[in-house]
Each structure stands twice: as C-alpha cells, then as structure tokens.
C-alpha cells in the first residue's frame, strides 16, 4: 500500500493548537498515522458527506477527507464531540 500525504487545513490547525496538552500528543500521533492507514480500525464514514471520515480520540473527533486518486488525507476539523458536527 502506498503512503498518503497528510495535510492539515488552516482551520483545523488552529483547532489543533487549542487542544488541551493531554489530547494534543495523541491527536498528532493519530493524524500522522493516517498517512499509512487512512481508514484505521474504528474510523467511521460520515453520513451525508462524500469521502468524509472521522476518528475518535477520547471525547475529541478528527474529521478528514480522503482523496484516493491523489493519495491525500485532508484534516478539516478537530473538536470536542459536542461541537464537531455543528
């Protein structure tokens, strides 16, 4: 399997910077691993969205797009579960 490039969109980067320190290291580790496995165990495809997925990190969610043609994972949102789908 070939490796995917991972990009973090500007809005998601700002959300990442605002994460509590206890969550930040775990989030970065999970995001980096998406380059090797963009659909890890436990990820879910979001209903009503084309190619949009989410992974769970405790009470936090990382929402991302997968472009299999370009081999690209784009992180679009990182937020607490109560806020992420607004």
Q: Predicted segments — roles?
A:
Residues 1-57, 68-74, 83-86:
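Basic, Lys/Arg-enriched alpha-helical interface segments
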Residues 79:
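Residues forming the ATP-binding cleft of Hanks-type serine/threonine protein kinase domains
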């Amino acid at each position: 399997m070939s490796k995917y490039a991972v990009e973090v969109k500007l809005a998601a980067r700002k959300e990442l910077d605002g994460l509590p320190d206890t969550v930040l290291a775990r989030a970065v580790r999970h995001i980096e691993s998406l380059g090797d496995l963009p659909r890890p165990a436990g990820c879910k495809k979001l209903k009503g969205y084309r190619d949009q997925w989410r992974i769970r990190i405790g009470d936090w969610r990382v929402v991302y797009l997968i472009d299999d043609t370009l081999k690209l994972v784009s992180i679009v949102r990182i937020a607490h579960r109560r806020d992420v789908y607004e």
